[in-house]
Amino acid sequence: SGSCTVKTCWMRLPTFRTVGDFLKDRFDGASRVIYGNKGSNRASRVELHHLEPENPAHKPPSPVDLVYFEKSPNFCTYSGKTGTVGTAGRSCNSSSPALDGCELLCCGRGYRTRMQRVTERCNCTF
C-alpha cells in the first residue's frame, strides 16, 4: 500500500499589461548607440566590437537596456523617402491627452477648432 505524490511547478508569464509597462519603461529610457571598435588586439578579439553611447557623457548600455542605431523618422511631416504621410489636416480631439489629442497629433504646430452639428435619424419611440 504505497502512495505516489507528484509535485508540479508552474512558471507563469506576467500579464500582458505588466510586460507592456516594462517595455514602455525601457523604450522611454532607450539610448542611441554607435558600433565601437576597441582596436585590433588579438587577445581581446571577443570584445573587439561593442556598443558605445553616441554621447560620450552617457554611461554604456547594460545588457537589459534598449538601444537604437538610427533615429526614428519625423512622423509629423510628409516624407516620400520614408513613406510617412504626416499629420497635417487630420482631425484631433482637443480635450484628449491620448494619441488622438491635438497637442500630440499636431506636433506643436497648433490647430483650428471647428464646431460641427450632426443630425442623424434614429428609430426612437417616445
From Swiss-Prot:
GO BP terms, alphabetized: canonical Wnt signaling pathway; cell fate commitment; neuron differentiation
Residues carrying lipid (O-palmitoleoyl serine): S1
UniProt-recorded name of the protein: Protein Wnt-1
Species assigned in the record: Sceloporus occidentalis (Western fence lizard)
Annotated family: Belongs to the Wnt family.
Role, per record: Ligand for members of the frizzled family of seven transmembrane receptors. Acts in the canonical Wnt signaling pathway by promoting beta-catenin-dependent transcriptional activation. Plays an essential role in the development of the embryonic brain and central nervous system (CNS). Has a role in osteoblast function, bone development and bone homeostasis.
Top-level taxon in the UniProt lineage: Eukaryota
SMART domains on file: WNT1
Entry GO MF terms: cytokine activity; frizzled binding
Post-translational modification: Palmitoleoylation is required for efficient binding to frizzled receptors. Palmitoleoylation is necessary for proper trafficking to cell surface. Depalmitoleoylated by NOTUM, leading to inhibit Wnt signaling pathway.
